[in-house]
Amino acid sequence: METKNINVCETFPDGTPIDGWFYDTNVPSLEKIGKQYVLTAYGILDDGKLHTKEIQALIDLAAKDGGGVIVVPSGTYLTGALFFKQGVHLYVAQGGMLKGSDDCSDYPICETRIEGESCLYFSALINADGLDGFVMCGPGTIDGNGMRSWKAFWLRRSWNPKCTNKDEQRPRLVYLSNCKNVLIADLNLQNSHFWTTHLYHCDHVKYLNCRIFSPASPVKAPSTDAIDIDVCSDILVKNCYLEVNDDSVVLKGGKGPWADTAPENGANERILVEDCVYGFCHGCLT
């Protein structure tokens, strides 16, 4: 655990004190997160088959039984969109990979938030709404498997240079909305179809020791922002490696001529990004 002398008065630019929450970089062990639901113990195998229904059923079972942690062991496990519930967490073990389907039809259309507006769009690979205390961690990898979408996007751009992300829709890797007290730690998050992680109306979220990556070549991964922070407060991004074919950390709050008046929009407050390393990206902070 890294600690600082919290008696030293450090403040945000507006003079607000940086409280002790920002200095606590503890990551709980797997044993402390909760009862373990290991994929292979429930017949979900590293066999190249799509296991969305089985993994979602395991999430639902854990929630029904009082919570726990879905454990992705060594191997590669293919899935579409997953929807986490209160008290259910995610741990990806060393050598483990939760790999997203490359077929966008495996990500149901839902009411969500894109480009500063509420709209219908694909769900993400990992979805959580209204959760308190959600943990995503482990030394393994969550891979969006986005190559097929990237190629489709650039093909469309070749005949319609003005096409947007709403014209050529594709899923995000992680979307958290209305959540609080979230920890995302030690993970490799890579190859998202679209934005890699997106927080909307969340507070007290920590990214610790993560590697977030999408390629700029040989096929550019379009609009794969590493961390989109959208109408959020109290966010810590610390000791992460960020290399994406767009912006690394993005502050969003609304878009368009009525952005300042729409009730779903707003400011981001108390955002701290420190001790991070940046590879190729369009901007470190935008």
Model-derived features with residue positions:
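Extracellular "leader-to-stem" segments immediately downstream of a signal peptide or signal-anchor
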Residues: 1-178, 183, 194, 208-210, ...
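Short, histidine-centered active-site or binding-site loop motifs used for metal coordination
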Residues: 41-44, 188, 253-255
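Alpha-helix capping and helix-loop boundary segments enriched in small/acidic/polar residues
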Residues: 46-49, 224, 228, 259-264
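Parallel beta-helix/beta-solenoid
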Residues: 85-87, 93, 131, 174, ...
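Carbohydrate-interacting regions of secretory-pathway proteins
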Residues: 166, 226, 275
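Short glycine/acidic-rich loop motifs that flank beta-strands on beta-rich extracellular proteins
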Residues: 67, 80-81, 101-103, 145-149, ...
